Amino acid sequence: MKNSVRLALVASMAALPLMVPSAQAQQASAMTFFVTSAGSGKGADLGGLEGADRHCQQLAQAAGSNGKTWHAYLSTQGSGAVNAKDRIGKGPWQNAKGDVIASDVTDLHSANNKISKQTAITEKSTPINGRGDTPNTHDILTGSQPDGTAFAAGEDRTCKNWTSSGEGAAMVGHHDRTGLDDSAAAKSWNASHPSRGQGGGCSQDALKGTGGAGLFYCFAAN
């Protein structure tokens, strides 16, 4: 009897390591939203929308999410401008832990969305540093206005449509909904302020200088 109990305990303990990856795989499979755990390494030069989407796809698949089409939440300007809100599907979207951040596009761009430092996590379920952390990386690239639409042509807000790592500027949002004051912009997840820096606001150093790391949001479009 004692031996059978011991064997049962040993068997159950041996199964624990197998259960953890299984649970993680299930979470990754259900994930439809994340913040990239790493940027391109070239500042806001993401290789255009195509390169940004590819980065989302690669990170998601590496985390165990298959069968989904991932798009970066980024707008472009000028001829053929693209609105970020039009390229991310219909929702709902949830993070790798199962927290629903919005039910649809309208909800996402309303005060009701649930994006916060606790929910805007990476594809690996890890948190992103925010204001007060070292280093602060809460500036998330979007190139978008608060309603998810593109800026008019003229003043650069997309680092030359995500192809510049020098001149230009990109609109960023604060994933932790925290800034220098209590203004709506400071608390905006997608339209807080333009990047800036000597020689332009699109280099990796420029993005770091204002509290960023070249990260961006990814959404499952299907």
Question: Which stretches of residues belong to each language-model region?
Answer:
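Bacterial N-terminal signal peptides that target proteins for export
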Residues: 1-10, 18-22
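Short, functionally important structural connectors and interaction interfaces within domains
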Residues: 10-11, 41
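Secreted/extracellular ectodomain signature
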Residues: 23-222
